[in-house]
């Protein structure tokens, strides 16, 4: 078989082997192992389908299609809690995403500024990432499938209490041997999903400040976006900035404390000194 120059042999074989529908989206959130219930259009900005975003100029790159449509609830959590985002295509615990869709998974946070915020603009900080493990020759997506669509991460322990938008993103590289701007039929596939979270209780005073803008920060030339997974490689550069270090910020902050009270001011001072 003659293989056209614009597509590698490995990419063609993967294209022929994969099913027609192999996409995914987020359905639920767990806090410290407790299921918060079906989050579709409740606390998750749920897109109308499982299709990927490939255009880096699209506003849907931030929070997917319908990303600016309000949803009524927030997941309640505390700084330092373990959160689990649950992904699948149709059936819970099965049919997560096609194994050919190899790639990283990253998690981001932004201050919640408005019910209609769509995630565009310089508002995001990365709080977790996982890409390619050369020792096992496996991707984050492989781990997601093995875990039946469950992806764990921890909220920064020094995060200031308040309302936030959390964004998790899967990037699939089975067609990124060509970039979307050069060949719209191919390119890296982005699966972003945004969740409303209310961080309560005792935390720090760390406020996410990386100010990353997906439409400006992601480039078609980035080695973690224009990535040919069908060549030999032993490492992978995850797109975006490094993980935000919330520990750099500072002190304790107690949600809802009236610091006009001398007693509560003393509590704050003790918290800072710990």
UniProtKB/Swiss-Prot annotation:
Biotechnological relevance of this protein: Lignocellulose is the most abundant polymeric composite on Earth and is a recalcitrant but promising renewable substrate for industrial biotechnology applications. Together with cellobiose dehydrogenases (CDHs) an enzymatic system capable of oxidative cellulose cleavage is formed, which increases the efficiency of cellulases and put LPMOs at focus of biofuel research.
Record note on cofactor: Binds 1 copper ion per subunit.
Range of residues in the leader sequence: 1-22
Gene3D superfamilies associated with the record: 2.70.50.70
Catalytic activity: [(1->4)-beta-D-glucosyl]n+m + reduced acceptor + O2 = 4-dehydro-beta-D-glucosyl-[(1->4)-beta-D-glucosyl]n-1 + [(1->4)-beta-D-glucosyl]m + acceptor + H2O
Enzyme's top EC category: oxidoreductase
Localization annotation: Secreted
Disulfide bridges in this chain: 63-194
Residues reported in the UniProt entry to bind Cu(2+): 23, 101, 191
Residues bound to (1,4-beta-D-glucosyl)n: 67, 98, 100, 177
E.C. no: 1.14.99.56
Amino-acid positions noted as binding O2 in the UniProt annotation, renumbered to this chain: 174
Known role: Lytic polysaccharide monooxygenase (LPMO) that depolymerizes crystalline and amorphous polysaccharides via the oxidation of scissile alpha- or beta-(1-4)-glycosidic bonds, yielding C4 oxidation products. Catalysis by LPMOs requires the reduction of the active-site copper from Cu(II) to Cu(I) by a reducing agent and H(2)O(2) or O(2) as a cosubstrate. Cleaves a range of polysaccharides, including cellulose, xyloglucan, mixed-linkage glucan and glucomannan.
Name of the molecule in the record: AA9 family lytic polysaccharide monooxygenase A
């Amino acid at each position: 078989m003659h293989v056209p120059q614009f597509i590698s042999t490995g990419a063609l074989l993967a294209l022929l082997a994969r099913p027609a529908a192999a996409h995914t989206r987020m359905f639920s959130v767990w806090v410290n192992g407790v299921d918060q219930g079906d989050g579709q259009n409740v606390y998750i900005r749920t897109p109308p389908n499982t299709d990927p975003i490939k255009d880096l100029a699209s506003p849907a790159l931030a929070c997917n299609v319908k990303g600016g449509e309000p949803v009524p609830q927030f997941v309640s959590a505390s700084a330092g809690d373990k959160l689990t985002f649950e992904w699948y295509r149709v059936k819970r615990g099965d049919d997560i995403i096609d194994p050919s869709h190899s790639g990283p998974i990253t998690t981001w946070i932004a201050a919640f500024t408005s019910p209609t915020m769509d995630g565009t603009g310089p508002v995001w900080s990365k709080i977790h990432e996982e890409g390619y493990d050369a020792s096992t020759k496996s991707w984050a997506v492989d781990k997601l499938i093995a875990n039946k669509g469950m992806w764990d991460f921890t909220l920064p322990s020094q995060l200031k209490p308040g309302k936030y938008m959390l964004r998790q993103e899967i990037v699939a590289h089975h067609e990124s041997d060509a970039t979307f701007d050069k060949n719209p039929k191919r390119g890296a596939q982005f699966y972003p999903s945004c969740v409303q979270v209310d961080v309560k209780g005792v935390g720090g005073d760390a406020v996410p400040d990386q100010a990353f803008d997906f439409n400006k920060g992601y480039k078609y030339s980035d080695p973690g976006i224009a990535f040919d997974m069908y060549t030999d490689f032993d490492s992978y550069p995850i797109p975006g900035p490094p993980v935000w270090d919330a520990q750099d910020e500072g002190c304790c902050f107690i949600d809802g404390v009236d610091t006009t009270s001398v007693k509560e001011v003393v509590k704050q001072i003790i918290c800072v000194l710990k």
